[in-house]
Amino acid sequence: MDDSNASTSLSVMLIVSRGDEAVRWYQAALGAEVLWDLGGVAGLHVAGAPFFIHEAVPGRRREPSPSEVGMTTTRIEVFTDDAGALIDRAAAAGATDVEPVTDHETPWGNHRQGGFTDPFGHRWSVGDRTPLRNLAKPLPGP
């Protein structure tokens, strides 16, 4: 089979305790747009980047929400032209553990990044686009 024209996309499905509330929060805080909504399960996108919401199913131990287990093992990265404005918007909508944007020296140059935790326990990092702009440059190896 010739896969030369095949493409692959990667997305995340966020398990949340309250699906419909999560959809409204991501709309208000991130400017997410709804692709489809089945009630408790929804497809959204931010600036064309899709992600999905699924309300936690009681008893389904393989897919608990962060609020059920008291932690998350994933950090979601958002790259934008104005990281501070997005973090401020999330904070105004009820985000917690807000970290203001600060400068970080990286192999690809200065990277401005901050973050927050959404009301459903997911950790978000929000930064400028420097990591995306400089991906073509080889990084120094070990």
Locations of regions flagged by a protein language model:
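Conserved ATPase active-site switch/coordination loops adjacent to the nucleotide-binding site
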Residues: 120
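Vicinal oxygen chelate
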Residues: 1-13, 23-117, 127-142
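Short, surface-exposed ligand-recognition loops at beta-strand->loop->(often short) alpha-helix junctions
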Residues: 14-18
